[in-house]
Amino acid sequence: MKFGVVARRDKLEALKLAYRVYDFLKVSGFDVVVDEDTYRYLGEFSEDDVLPLEEFDVDIIVVIGGDGTILRVEHKTKKEIPILGINMGTLGFLTEVEPHETFFALSRVIEGDYHIDERIKLRTFLDGENRVPDALNEVAVLTGIPGKIIHLKYYIDGGLADEVRADGLIISTPTGSTGYAMSAGGPFVDPRLDVVVIAPLAPIALSSRPMVVPSSSRIDVRNVAMTREVILSVDGQFYTYLSPETEITIVRSPRKTKFVRFNREIYPKYTMKIKSRF
């Protein structure tokens, strides 16, 4: 078994724990690689074991950080590599264990005492081309001018679903339903469901409400106000300005995100984290 280790770059405790994980796995006889950014912020790792995330070819990536660190790993890795998330963030919806459980969790992984949790992702096409990363959480179409609304139409499988004047439109996976989409009034969606949430962001019309559609749906978003640019955000990690006439299409990605899990229960973990957030 070969491991990758990635740490949150702005937290010394995460970097130090990453080195302890690295050392533990090396001493246990496993091949271990570390991503370049982790090494850049803590140079104690062997330089021979340092690789860009894009070149990781391992069995499991141990990510020490929060959801943002996991999303960064997801966007940069080329393969569907299972992730073991150790929470060094705020809430850590995507992480599996707390720091004090790290080495017990690693021992269970080594013994094969775990299962893989697969999550759907969204793929975005801009004028028919896939030029942006797949989204684990959400794709957001946002106003390009703060304080100015945008006028959008969105279609489900070719049929007009709604026309909204709002700050934006969020298209979310079940995984992302506890994030930006929930802040926009969207529902909590059990991550085991195969659906997509569409949530207008601060719409003018009270009739513009969140929708839940099958993940097999094709979602087309069109900018009605052709004089106003929009911003496309993917998981809050990738941003790009789009010209007003850009045709945006969102579908379920053929790729999935895989997580190492030790417990098959969703509740009460998710609901407790949602409540602690507010």
Swiss-Prot record:
Superkingdom of source: Archaea
One function term, GO molecular function aspect: NAD+ kinase activity
InterPro entries cross-referenced by the UniProt entry: ATP-NAD_kinase_N, ATP-NAD_kinase_PpnK-typ_C, NAD/diacylglycerol_kinase_sf, NADK
Pfam family, one: NAD_kinase
Cofactor: a divalent metal cation
Keyword terms: ATP-binding, Cytoplasm, Kinase, NAD, NADP, Nucleotide-binding, Transferase
Function of the protein: Involved in the regulation of the intracellular balance of NAD and NADP, and is a key enzyme in the biosynthesis of NADP. Catalyzes specifically the phosphorylation on 2'-hydroxyl of the adenosine moiety of NAD to yield NADP.
Database matches in HAMAP family: NAD_kinase
Catalysed reaction, written as an equation: NAD(+) + ATP = ADP + NADP(+) + H(+)
UniProt EC number: 2.7.1.23
Active-site positions on this chain: D67 (proton acceptor)
Protein name as annotated: NAD kinase
Principal location listed in the UniProt entry: cytoplasm
GO biological process, one term: NADP biosynthetic process
Family under the similarity heading: Belongs to the NAD kinase family.
One Gene Ontology cellular component annotation held by this UniProt entry: cytoplasm
Gene3D superfamilies for this protein: Probable inorganic polyphosphate/atp-NAD kinase, domain 1 (3.40.50.10330), Probable inorganic polyphosphate/atp-NAD kinase, domain 2 (2.60.200.30)
